[in-house]
């Protein structure tokens, strides 16, 4: 890993960091010199693999298993971060669920499941980390949104609504936390090359559909934007939804 050290001395919590975009974000922030709390809901093996990758490159990392919808588990995660590393400077709310269901067939429990993770999870994480973020003097919160919040998407009313709410949450927090020196931004991925279940392969025409670049993004593309927003070059950037989707927002 190339380490330019712009995040040296900082501590980052990344939720949903065991795979895909979350994993890429954890690795990118570690490349910048940050110590990483790698959160996963239940898959310890995946989280430990990310920690090993960080440590093998000379970084520092900690596994913290816990469901972001569980306020007590999130409090324990924040406490573990401070106990191990002494501080929290960066929080990346990446944990999310991928679900599809026609709205007319959707149960309230299915609706609630998405809200619990995406919105309540972000709420719990910011609340738990806020005292440490304030002490940082230059704290950063990054929420990972989704292009569907702007375009809508069939059979994903719950996901679309939650991601749209996350953008509103970002803008509200940017106001609320500015006096504490905390920036709050949302990164909005589009078509990103992450593995799908074998029984639900991605249709070929979806691979670049809507992008104006004609290519599909990688988790590392999202991670690079997150890393920038966590660094000194983004000190004057807050309350923004940064689209990382090959211009799909323009072509939608």
Where are these regions (language model features)?
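Residue(s) in the substrate-gating loop at a strand-loop-helix junction
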Residues: 146
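Short, small/polar-rich loop/turn modules that mediate ligand/substrate recognition or access, typified
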Residues: 138, 178, 183, 237-239
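Short C-terminal tail/terminal secondary-structure segment
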Residues: 2-3, 151, 205, 227, ...
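Substrate-binding pocket helix/loop in short-chain dehydrogenase/reductase
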Residues: 102-103, 110-115, 197, 207
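Conserved glycine-rich cofactor-binding loop
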Residues: 11, 18-20
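Alpha-helical segment proximal to the catalytic Tyr-Lys
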Residues: 131, 175-176, 235
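Active-site helix of classical SDR
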Residues: 126, 162, 170
């Amino acid at each position: 890993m190339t380490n330019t050290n712009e995040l040296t001395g900082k501590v980052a919590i990344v939720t949903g960091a065991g795979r895909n975009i979350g994993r890429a974000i954890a690795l990118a922030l570690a490349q910048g010199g940050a110590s990483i709390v790698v959160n996963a809901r239940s898959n310890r093996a995946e989280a430990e693999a990310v920690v090993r990758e960080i440590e093998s490159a000379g970084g520092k990392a900690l596994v913290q298993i816990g469901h972001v919808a569980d306020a007590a588990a999130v409090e324990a995660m924040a406490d573990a971060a401070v106990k191990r590393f002494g501080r929290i400077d960066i929080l990346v709310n990446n944990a999310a669920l991928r679900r599809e269901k026609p709205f007319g067939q959707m149960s309230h429990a299915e609706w609630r499941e998405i809200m619990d993770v995406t919105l309540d999870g972000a709420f719990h994480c910011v609340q738990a980390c806020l005292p440490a973020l304030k002490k940082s003097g230059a704290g950063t919160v990054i929420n990972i949104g989704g292009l569907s919040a702007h375009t809508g998407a069939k059979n994903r009313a719950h996901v679309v609504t939650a991601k749209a709410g996350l953008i509103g949450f970002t803008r509200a927090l940017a106001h609320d936390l500015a006096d504490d020196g905390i920036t709050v931004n949302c990164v909005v991925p589009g078509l990103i090359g992450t593995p799908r279940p074998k029984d639900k392969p991605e249709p070929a025409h979806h691979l670049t559909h809507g992008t104006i670049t004609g290519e599909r993004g990688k988790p590392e593309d999202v991670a690079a934007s997150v890393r920038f927003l966590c660094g000194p070059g983004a000190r004057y950037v807050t309350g923004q939804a940064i689209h990382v989707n090959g211009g799909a927002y323009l072509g939608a």
